[in-house]
Amino acid sequence: MKLLLVSALLGCFATVYAAPAEGMVRWCVKSEKELKKCHDLAANVAGFSCVRRDDSLECIQAIKREEADAITLDGGDIYIAGLHNYNLQPIIAEDYGEDSDTCYYAVAVAKKGTEFGFLDLRGKKSCHTGLGKSAGWNIPIGTLVTVGQIQWAGIEDRPVESAVSDFFNASCAPGANRDSQLCQLCMGDCSRSHNEPYYDYSGAFQCLKDGAGEVAFIKHLTVPAAEKASYELLCKDNTRAPIDSYKTCHLARVPAHAVVSRKDPRLANLIYSKLMAVTNFNLFSSDGYAAKNLMFKDSTQNLVQLPMTTDSFLYLGAEYMSTIRSLTKAQATGVTSRAIKWCAVGHKEKVKCDAWTINSFTDGDSRIECQDAPTVDECIKKIMRKEADAIAVDGGEVFTAGKCGLVPVMVEQYDEVRCSAPGEASSYFAVAVAKRGSGLTWTTLKGKRSCHTGLGRTAGWNIPMGLIHRRTMNCDFTTYFSKGCAPGFEVDSPFCAQCKGSGKSVGGDGSKCKASSEEQYYGYNGAFRCLVEDAGDVAFIKHTIVPEMTDGSGPVWAQNLMSSDFELLCQDGTTKPVTHFRECHLAKVPAHAVITRPESRGEVVSILLEQQARFGSSGSDSSFNMFKPDFGKNLLFKDSTKCLQEIPSGTKFQGFLGEEYMIAMQSLRECSNSTSDLEKACTFHSC
């Protein structure tokens, strides 16, 4: 087992309310045994102190109130900690090594020879790690409800604890009402702490071993090696299997326990650095404390820092979150609205979306409702959480959304002929544009200033930087371009130096380099404007932008521009007029697409087809147009869109983007600084 050390946790209850010293981390413990281990750690490393509370919820509340800083929690408690009233986030995951990594298997275990299966548990005595915990409660109870073993219609009918009490003969589920049947088998106070001997994995197993219960809901590593031969796993198909067959016989694979703290990157880094710096102490052993799994699981091999944008939803994943919600929220009743919630990025898109909502009313109900977020990544999160349903995004964002489990369902078509006679997949050309006569070529861009549509965008980042990376094999693009504007970078990056912000006299800097229309150099039009206003020497955009913005077609800032004032930079080192994009481009790439959750595909497609029949380019209702720039350029959809076309059902993001694009993306993903924090969070683990 890899030895990791956690810093000392000095402190005592009397100092709980004192403001922490600079660089101090206060760990929350839930029992005297954990406190003893915590104090022993304090003898090894300065900078930690201990805060004693009675259970996980009290620790969560203490961290929220800044009376403590961190605690390791299981998935069920991570969910609670992430709710709006606490707003904590997982920052470090336990790593169990081998194939488990930062996930583990939730299993049901019984003594060998007892001859009942998972579907025969009614009337049996059960041992649970704790009420609301992952392997001990949420997964087994959620599974039993799903397969119809436990009859429960939702909390509007009765609490799930009542249904579980009716199902099992008796139980020990620490954290339940002490006088209830769910505490009948417990040996101590039935609290969710080590004050209850049957609490946690080792306690639930002890409950089974002692004969108090007939089945224990635990994790796959709980049964000691010397005792495995005496126990068996209960599989969901009602068969049994040896303890080591957990990969094929388990209830679910769930995210590892994780350290949670407040949403403060500096505090998260401090906690991680303290843990990694501890020496001469085995952080993952509870030997000598007459208990197991104190502060961390004893089976932990390592600790892994999570991406800073990871929240409880991203860490736990949509499937596990759905399981928890099914046990804690009322089931949906009544008729739901036949509307889709569109996610608008920034104020300008929200204004257009609100107008769409008003015009979409049919028979007294709107077909489009609006949610807004500051960035596309935040919209993707909202769609994952079911707070929004859909948004149209560029190919790079389709890639990120796909990594987060969303799917492309409709694609923008820029050729009107193909709207009525679909054929080749909708696409556009990614191009590099410079001012005519600048002397620049594709091969002389090093040291110049660059204008990008945004970090992670197709034409503006992924294609040009992928080509540059393939040539230089250097991920530090600040050594290639001297500075530029690539909205989405940290504001102190050289790739934000040339960004303009909102242009407002008050509070404008807050929008600088933000990946939304509030940043004037964001998106296709913004990147072109960056070039026009001499903030950059080259703009990476799509082939239609120059003609759309020049020769009298553009906004005020582009009024006097001629398309002939600009030229394309070809990969062979030559330049060509902007009309020669078919011979002079960086790549031909998929058009922008509407993304949603897989289960929402049908409804989103149906409503959008209906909406474009009314408000599309050839729509029956002239009061609103989905694709015209009446509210500003390229809002909600590209202005060049002629129609939306359905993507064949079952198409995943990889198939939509195509092999060439996927190869380019995989190459660029060798550079961590070209991967968004959201994508890192979504791909951190897949349980």
Curated annotation (Swiss-Prot):
Subcellular location: Secreted
GO biological processes: antibacterial humoral response; iron ion transport
Pfam families associated with the record: Transferrin
Stored Gene3D superfamilies: Periplasmic binding protein-like II
GO CC, any one term: plasma membrane
Chain positions carrying an annotated carbohydrate: 169, 673
UniProtKB keywords: Disulfide bond, Glycoprotein, Ion transport, Iron, Iron transport, Metal-binding, Repeat, Secreted, Signal, Transport
Binding residues for Fe(3+) 2: 394, 428, 524, 592
Keyword Repeat in record: yes
Residues involved in hydrogencarbonate 2 binding: 453, 457, 459-460
Record-annotated Transferrin-like domain positions: 25-329, 340-670
Protein name according to UniProt: Serotransferrin
Annotated source species: Oncorhynchus kisutch
